[in-house]
Amino acid sequence: RVYAFDVDGTLTPIRSCWRFIHNILNTVHRSRNYSKYFFEGLLSYDEWVAMELNLWKNIDVEVFKRIVYAIPWRNGIEDLVEFRHKKSRDIFIAISGGFNFLGERAVHELKFNSYIGVELEILNGRLTGYALSYPDFNGKGTELIEYLRSNSIEYSELICIGDNINDIDMFRHCDVSIAFCPSKNLRRDYINIFINSCNIRNLVNVLYTI
């Protein structure tokens, strides 16, 4: 089996690590209309990403990493680590529109196999304001399947866990889709299981039954 977990709002209580970082770096007021413009069709996702990252140009990467490492995991995360230990033959992947540093934490702290996220360009220890790669807002499922194929990962079942509308494409590609602590914008389309609790322990209890 392959378990694919969204990160922001699923593994962490922070719905958006982008906004979390904007708040810390005091750039939230400059970016507050970007999402509105995107959802109104005035910006492409590539333009939205570029405009946000430009606000962090020349930020020391170690400062940026410390902010990301300050993001907590959800309550009950230790149960997921135990579940992952018991499922040692299965593949656990973190897939996020958030940053690779949070994906690295999922590998090191939660013992996931790998991650897919925003890979930031770094030059001389500072952010350049550009990204090397990132999942499209409406393309996480496509990105996940391509990752599995390119890494020759075979599986009998693909189980996906997410919380928001940008996880819908991922849900469409999965054998079992689970909405965990879902946002109010997420409808039941393409979702097999809804878990309104935000405690990871309750999610893990469901995973044991699948």
Predicted features along the sequence, with ranges:
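Active-site neighborhood of HAD-like aspartate-dependent phosphohydrolases
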Residues: 1-46, 50
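Short acidic/polar alpha-helix capping motifs at helix-coil junctions
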Residues: 14-15, 43-48, 63-70, 131-134, ...
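Short, surface-exposed acidic
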Residues: 29-35, 61-64, 155
